[in-house]
């Protein structure tokens, strides 16, 4: 992305994936923050949603999103949500959507499932993050788009709603945020 002028092209529907990833700590944090803020500016200026990736950087991500919202509104999605409650609450407070991947189906993801139970359907998306993070029962395999069904089935059961409701609402949310 060279700048917000790149966003006016007809085929661009979002800015990102962008954000902070401190997990491996191989990219200088200062540079990540600078790039994240530039992408937020592009989102704000273009009106296109921001697709946010955050890993091992919950506090900093929330601080930046709050600060930047104070400079002017922008919308977005927390992509492949697998982090803490603070990120979910901040995102929802700022009008963002939260996208869930196969991680929610993993045996060790109970703390994530507790948060997901509280995410309103009107702010939820379902994704694959292919080729990574295949849901149970495909865990360990290369993820593919068809497996999104397994994630959606799991989320429907978790939230006590029909599968069709998850699919319908996630689809509607996709069009609201990304196709607008």
Language-model segments: residues:
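Short, small-residue-biased leader/transition segments that mark boundaries at the very start
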Residues: 1-8
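Divalent metal-binding pocket/active-site signature
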Residues: 9-94, 106, 114-115, 119, ...
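His/Asp/Glu-enriched short active-site or ligand-binding loop at hydrolase and phosphoryl-transfer sites
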Residues: 95-109
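Short, conserved catalytic or interaction motifs in soluble domains
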Residues: 121, 135, 156
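Conserved beta/loop motifs at nucleotide-recognition and modification sites
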Residues: 129
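Mid-to-C-terminal alpha-helical segments outside catalytic/metal-binding sites
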Residues: 148-180
């Amino acid at each position: 992305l060279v700048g917000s002028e790149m966003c006016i092209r007809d085929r661009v529907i979002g800015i990102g994936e962008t954000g902070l990833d401190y997990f491996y700590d191989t990219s200088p944090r200062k540079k990540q923050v600078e790039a994240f803020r530039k992408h937020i500016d592009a989102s704000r200026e273009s009106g296109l949603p921001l697709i946010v990736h955050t890993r091992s950087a919950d506090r900093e991500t929330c601080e930046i999103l709050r600060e930047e919202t104070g400079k002017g509104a922008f919308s977005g999605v927390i992509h492949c949500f697998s982090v803490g409650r603070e990120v979910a609450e901040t995102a929802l407070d700022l009008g963002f959507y939260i996208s869930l991947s196969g991680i929610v189906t993993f045996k060790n993801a109970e703390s994530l499932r507790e948060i997901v139970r509280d995410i309103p359907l009107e702010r939820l998306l379902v994704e694959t993050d292919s080729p990574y993070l295949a849901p149970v029962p495909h865990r360990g395999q290369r993820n593919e788009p068809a497996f999104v069904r397994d994630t959606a089935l799991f989320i429907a059961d978790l939230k006590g709603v029909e599968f069709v409701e998850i699919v319908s609402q996630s689809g509607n949310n996709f069009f609201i945020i990304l196709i607008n």
